[in-house]
Amino acid sequence: RAALAKLPRTLPTFDRVGRKTMTFRSRTKGTRRVILLAGCAQRALDPRINASTIRVLNKLGVEVTVREEAFCCGALAHHIGDAGAAREAVRATLLSWQEELDKGDVDAIVANASGCGTMVKDYAHMVGDDPELAGIAARVSALARDVSEVIADLPLAGIVTPAPEGRGSITYHSACSLQHGQKIHDLPMQLLREVGYEVKQPVEPHLCCGSAGVYNILQPEMAEGLRQRKLENISRAGAPMVAAGNIGCIQQLDGDIPVRHTIQYIDWACGGPPAV
């Protein structure tokens, strides 16, 4: 019943990014190349996130490759304790990325869902005892970056479009997997400010929104209590828009105040489609 309650009433057209191996080349001269983890749940629930990620990176001179076989990082299976399924997903993803890495000149492996990014950064620990995978897992974990980390190293100010009347204010929700799992808290807010938004934080920013892993399904009462507490704090912050870096949080909190991925707001500020 809890799982059914979480299903959206409608779904967008499934994301074409990742249906096959693709490379999105920048129109500007650049020297960087990254692999993007397109994700599984995110591709079904909000394809706009990958589209915004690719647009922004391309404008910054970054070539983006997505591998068809790397369809899932294994986090969802790992969250429910299905170690076998998680390991198979990890293996498929690692072997696919190994082919790409062996071509050379890959600067980063980019995740734009922080739950996935935390998982990928932990691959070296997760399969470090596997002789087949240990080497490539260490290589991948060393290259794994949240999208905010990649953009922070690039000349973002150079692609921002003018906004004489300002861009408005955003409340930033810090996903647990980003602020606790990856120790990234201030950076996304800095990027939002850099492109012209006023950024607010809710009180108790360290608290979970109730959507970590699958306990919003397995422990719905606890998860709903956390959700309501987070929404009340967001409402008190007073901004008309909310940014977050994880699809689970976005789905959990989206409602009267629209919640979008941080990269969608950055894309909007750089000439992309409106985020809300």
Indicate residue ranges for each PLM-predicted region:
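Iron-sulfur cluster-binding electron-transfer modules in prokaryotic oxidoreductases
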Residues: 1-276
